[in-house]
């Protein structure tokens, strides 16, 4: 993973959250799909699954920075483990 890919994944995460109604969450695979689509449009054929390690690392940093929070089935998660959803940090 490069710093550029990490920043791109963080930006995509925050953009997807900004496009959603307050209180809603996104799945990390949505971020990976958005990144893969953008790269494929640029001429590279990228499978979204290949983007998941980059997305996970970006999410970890966003959690550390306090910009997003994680949950699963409505219960908060302190750190990424297993399946999870992402929401804005400013929301309950």
Across the structure, where does each feature detected by a protein language model lie?
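Positively charged, polyanion-binding regions of nucleic-acid-associated proteins
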Residues: 4-29, 53
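A general secondary-structure junction signal
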Residues: 30, 72-74
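Short, positively charged loop/turn segments that connect secondary-structure elements
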Residues: 36-56
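Alpha-helical DNA-recognition elements
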Residues: 61
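A short, conserved structural fragment
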Residues: 64-71
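Short, cationic-aromatic polyanion-contact patches
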Residues: 74-92
């Amino acid at each position: 993973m490069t710093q550029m890919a990490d920043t791109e994944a963080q930006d995509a995460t925050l953009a997807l959250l900004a496009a959603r109604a307050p209180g809603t969450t996104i799945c990390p695979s949505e971020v990976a799909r958005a990144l893969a689509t953008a790269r494929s449009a640029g001429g590279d054929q990228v499978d979204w699954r290949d983007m998941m390690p980059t997305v996970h690392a970006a999410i970890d940093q966003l959690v550390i920075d306090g910009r997003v929070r994680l949950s699963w089935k409505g219960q908060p998660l302190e750190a990424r483990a297993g399946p999870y959803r992402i929401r804005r940090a400013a929301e309950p």
